Amino acid sequence: MSGRERNGGRSAENNDKKERNERNGRNDRGGRNDRRNQQDERSQFIERVVTINRVSKVVKGGRRFSFTALVIVGDGQGMVGVGYGKAKEVPAAIQKGAEEARKNFFRVPMINGTITHPVQGEDAAGIVMMKPAAPGTGVIAGGAVRPVLECAGVQDILSKSLGSDNAINIVHATVAGLKQLVRPEEVAARRGKSLDEVAPAAMLRARAAGQGA
C-alpha cells in the first residue's frame, strides 16, 4: 500500500471519528462540550456579587477559614434570583452562589420598564420600599437594592431602604417585595372587575403597546 493510500485511509477514519464525536456531544480530544455549553448559558445572564465575607470555624486543630458570597443573577428581562455560596476559595463561592441563584429564579411583573404597583418588602430587620416611576427616571436605588433591580431588568423605579444596613437583609427584603407584585389581570380577577376599572390609563396604554414583562 502506498503512502498516499495510507494517508487517505487515516483522513477518512479521522472524519468518521469527528462525526461520531459531534453526534455524541464530544470534541476532537474526547471531552464533552458541556463546559462550553455551560459558559454560553452563563453569558446570557447578568451576575452581580453583592458581598464576599470570610468566615471561620473553630475545630480541634485550630480555625478553618472559608468564604461566603451573595450573588444575584438575572436575564435583564424580568427573571432574577438570589443565591448564597460558601467555599474555601472566593471563585468557588461565587460559582456556588450563582448556581443557587439560577435555581431560585422568579419573574418580576413589569409594565413599561417599571413595577406594576407600590410595594414594601421585609425580611429580618431589612425593610425596602419600592414605587413605580415614569419613563426616564432611572433606577433610584442604592446599596444592595440596585443590583437586584438591574439584574431583573427594571429601568425606572423609586426605592428606599428603611431598616437594617446589612446587605443580606436588604437583598432578601427587596426580593420579598418583588415577589409580592401582581399583574393587573390578577387583581381584576380577584376583585371581579374588568381590567379598565383596576389599572390606570397609562398602564393600559403601555400594555397595549407591548411594553409589559
Curated annotation (Swiss-Prot):
Keywords linked to the UniProt accession: Ribonucleoprotein, Ribosomal protein, RNA-binding, rRNA-binding
Region (Disordered): 1-41
GO molecular function, one term: rRNA binding
Domain of life: Bacteria
Stored PROSITE patterns: RIBOSOMAL_S5, S5_DSRBD
One BP annotation, GO: translation
Entry-linked InterPro entries: Ribosomal_Su5_D2-typ_SF (IPR020568), Ribosomal_uS5 (IPR000851), Ribosomal_uS5_bac-type (IPR005712), Ribosomal_uS5_C (IPR005324), Ribosomal_uS5_N (IPR013810), Ribosomal_uS5_N_CS (IPR018192), Ribsml_uS5_D2-typ_fold_subgr (IPR014721)
Domain S5 DRBM: 45-108
GO (cellular component) term, any one: small ribosomal subunit
Keyword set includes Membrane: no
Swiss-Prot/TrEMBL domain comment: The N-terminal domain interacts with the head of the 30S subunit; the C-terminal domain interacts with the body and contacts protein S4. The interaction surface between S4 and S5 is involved in control of translational fidelity.
Record's function text: With S4 and S12 plays an important role in translational accuracy. Located at the back of the 30S subunit body where it stabilizes the conformation of the head with respect to the body.
Record-stated family: Belongs to the universal ribosomal protein uS5 family.
PANTHER family named among the record's database cross-references: MITOCHONDRIAL RIBOSOMAL PROTEIN S5
Subunit structure: Part of the 30S ribosomal subunit. Contacts proteins S4 and S8.
Name of the protein described by the UniProt record: Small ribosomal subunit protein uS5
